[in-house]
Amino acid sequence: KNPVIHARSFGENRDKVTAYGRAYMKGMQDGGIIACSKHFPGHGDTEVDSHKALPVLPFSRERLDSLELYPFRDQIKHGVEMVMMGHLHIPALDSAVSSISYPIVTGLLRQELGFEGIIVTDALTMKGVSENMESAEIALAAYKAGVDILLKPGDIIASIDRLEAAMNSGECDIEEL
């Protein structure tokens, strides 16, 4: 169903996706390449391209745990070094877009799943996240959510200035940076 992810995935069967994903990740990392699992918390079962609009995953937490999150749990257990956040609306988890959601980035990925590696956003110019927010506010929201790398912020200078202002004002803790 997914217009963008379908051809870039290992399929629809969670066990095959998990096995192929683990083998691919292990091969990359054994070869000295940082593997990146994406698009957390699961972009496969959507019909909307997040480059153009915000996809919605209307599923229950139970469904998310049993299907979408299943391969990510396995990748984390087996030492994946990086996870890319997708721009998704998942009402069962939070009202904010997943890539700028503290409950999803820090609460679910870091605390609940125990991921200790690098978290990167998908491109912050994509309509899935940029439709209703300015570049600088998106960058700040992603940082506050717990993201380590902001991929392709729209206005880089404004984003840097906003993050710097947040650090200087105490809105964000410079020690966390």
PLM-predicted stretches and their roles:
Residues K1-G11:
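A glycine-rich phosphate/pyrophosphate-binding beta-strand-loop-alpha-helix module
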Residues E12-C172:
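Second-shell residues forming the walls of enzyme active-site clefts
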